């Protein structure tokens, strides 16, 4: 057997170089190939798939987040316009109710004034009728007094 003695090593030591060295090299290459094909490639593929999955999920999440922010901004704009519209409607309703109140008040005042005027005219009419009646009674009474005085004389 051919053996090389490195650094004063004896046969059967750690660095024996003999016919088993090529066999060991072949075993290491075969083990590397087997481990690579059976373990490292599948694990690497799983890791790559997982990284792609995670990166796709991150990209999708960013897209959805930007979409949500856009929708939120749109909803805030719609909410603000709805609030403005509601305030406008409330303001119009208040103005309309004020207008109706003023119209009703004016109508009530007009009716009250008309009733008051009617009552005044009726009172004047009754007063005039009472004066006419009183005047007629006074005339009748004075005529009666004159007739009695004339008859007594």
From Swiss-Prot:
UniProt GO cellular component terms: plasma membrane-derived thylakoid membrane; proton-transporting ATP synthase complex
Family: Belongs to the ATPase B chain family.
Gene3D superfamilies on file: F1F0 ATP synthase subunit B, membrane domain
Assembly and oligomerization: F-type ATPases have 2 components, F(1) - the catalytic core - and F(0) - the membrane proton channel. F(1) has five subunits: alpha(3), beta(3), gamma(1), delta(1), epsilon(1). F(0) has four main subunits: a(1), b(1), b'(1) and c(10-14). The alpha and beta chains form an alternating ring which encloses part of the gamma chain. F(1) is attached to F(0) by a central stalk formed by the gamma and epsilon chains, while a peripheral stalk is formed by the delta, b and b' chains.
Transmembrane segments: 23-40
Location (main, coarse): membrane
Role, per record: F(1)F(0) ATP synthase produces ATP from ADP in the presence of a proton or sodium gradient. F-type ATPases consist of two structural domains, F(1) containing the extramembraneous catalytic core and F(0) containing the membrane proton channel, linked together by a central stalk and a peripheral stalk. During catalysis, ATP synthesis in the catalytic domain of F(1) is coupled via a rotary mechanism of the central stalk subunits to proton translocation. Component of the F(0) channel, it forms part of the peripheral stalk, linking F(1) to F(0). The b'-subunit is a diverged and duplicated form of b found in plants and photosynthetic bacteria.
CDD domains reported for this sequence: ATP-synt_Fo_b
Protein name (record): ATP synthase subunit b'
PANTHER family membership: ATP SYNTHASE SUBUNIT B', CHLOROPLASTIC
Topology of the protein relative to the lipid bilayer: Single-pass membrane protein
Subcellular localization: Cellular thylakoid membrane
Molecular function terms from GO: proton-transporting ATP synthase activity, rotational mechanism; proton-transporting ATPase activity, rotational mechanism
Keywords: ATP synthesis, CF(0), Hydrogen ion transport, Ion transport, Membrane, Thylakoid, Transmembrane, Transmembrane helix, Transport
One Pfam family named in its UniProt record: ATP-synt_B
Gene: atpF2
């Amino acid at each position: 057997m051919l053996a090389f003695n490195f650094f004063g090593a004896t046969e059967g030591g750690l660095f024996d170089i003999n016919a088993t060295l090529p066999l060991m090299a072949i075993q290491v290459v075969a083990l590397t190939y087997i481990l690579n094909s059976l373990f490292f490639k599948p694990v690497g593929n799983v890791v790559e798939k997982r990284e792609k999955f995670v990166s796709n999920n991150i990209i999708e999440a960013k897209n959805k987040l930007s979409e949500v922010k856009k929708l939120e901004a749109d909803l805030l704009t719609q909410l603000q316009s709805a609030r403005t519209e509601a305030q406008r409607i409330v303001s119009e309703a208040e103005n309309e109710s004020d207008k109706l109140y003023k119209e009703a008040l004016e109508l009530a005042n007009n009716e009250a004034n008309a009733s008051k005027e009617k009552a005044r005219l009726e009172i004047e009419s009754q007063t005039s009728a009472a004066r006419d009646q009183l005047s007629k009674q006074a005339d009748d009474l004075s005529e009666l007094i004159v007739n009695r005085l004339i008859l007594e004389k």
